[in-house]
UniProtKB/Swiss-Prot annotation:
InterPro entries the record matches: Cybc1 (IPR027846)
Name of the protein in question: Cytochrome b-245 chaperone 1
Domain of life of the source: Eukaryota
The species this protein was found in: Homo sapiens
Assembly: Interacts with CYBB; CYBC1 may act as a chaperone stabilizing Cytochrome b-245 heterodimer.
Subcellular location field: Endoplasmic reticulum membrane
UniProt similarity note: Belongs to the CYBC1 family.
Principal subcellular localization: endoplasmic reticulum
Topology versus the membrane: Single-pass membrane protein
Function description: Functions as a chaperone necessary for a stable expression of the CYBA and CYBB subunits of the cytochrome b-245 heterodimer. Controls the phagocyte respiratory burst and is essential for innate immunity.
Length: 187
């Protein structure tokens, strides 16, 4: 699952993402290797602790982040939050939370982008296109597999922000002018 809808009202849309089953399975698998190495080795206690700690470190490093996206019309802001257990442990609980705040009126488009994921193929993510010309992904990592889940979230955000209604009159007149000037349509 790409993102889950936590709350949805007329003025607030709260989306969340937690590490998936693949991520947790990888954590358990890597940690099991460390525990097995410690249990079955004839090494000293220090080495056994090293095996478990090393595998725990690698396992947590491969754990996906917790992510949130909060679209709030009352404050006029989009808040994108990321929590990383790996960063939290690495900095001894001083860091681990990243937050990006964007004004709602700066969001011009919401689209789905395809990203190549090493060894696994293609992943998909929602990207916010801003008035400043920048693009910012809604989440830090792409989801594997079903593009339809990601497209559903993009449509949900587009309808919440009413972006489909924001086509300017100049764009409409330009598109109608180009259709009128098309020789194929003047038969």
């Amino acid at each position: 699952m790409y993102l889950q809808v936590e709350t949805r009202t007329s003025s607030r849309l709260h989306l969340k993402r937690a590490p998936g089953i693949r991520s947790w399975s990888l954590l358990v698998g890597i940690l099991s290797i460390g525990l097995a190495a410690a249990y079955y080795s004839g090494d000293s206690l220090g080495w056994k602790l090293f095996y478990v700690t090393g595998c725990l470190f690698v396992a947590v490093q491969n754990l996906e982040d917790w992510e949130e996206a909060i679209f709030d019309k009352s404050t006029g802001k989009v808040v994108l939050k990321t929590f990383s257990l790996y960063k939290k442990l690495l900095t001894l609980f001083r860091a681990g939370h990243d937050q990006v705040v964007v004004l709602l009126h700066d969001v011009r488009d919401v689209s789905v982008e395809e990203e190549k994921v090493r060894y696994f193929g293609k992943g998909y993510m929602v990207v916010l296109r801003l008035a400043t010309g920048f693009s910012h992904p809604l989440t830090q990592s792409a989801v594997m597999g079903h593009r339809s889940d990601v497209e559903a979230i993009a449509k949900l955000i587009t309808s919440f922000l009413e972006l489909h209604c924001l086509e300017s009159p100049t764009e409409l007149s330009q598109s109608s002018d180009s259709e009128a000037g098309d020789p194929a349509s003047q038969s």
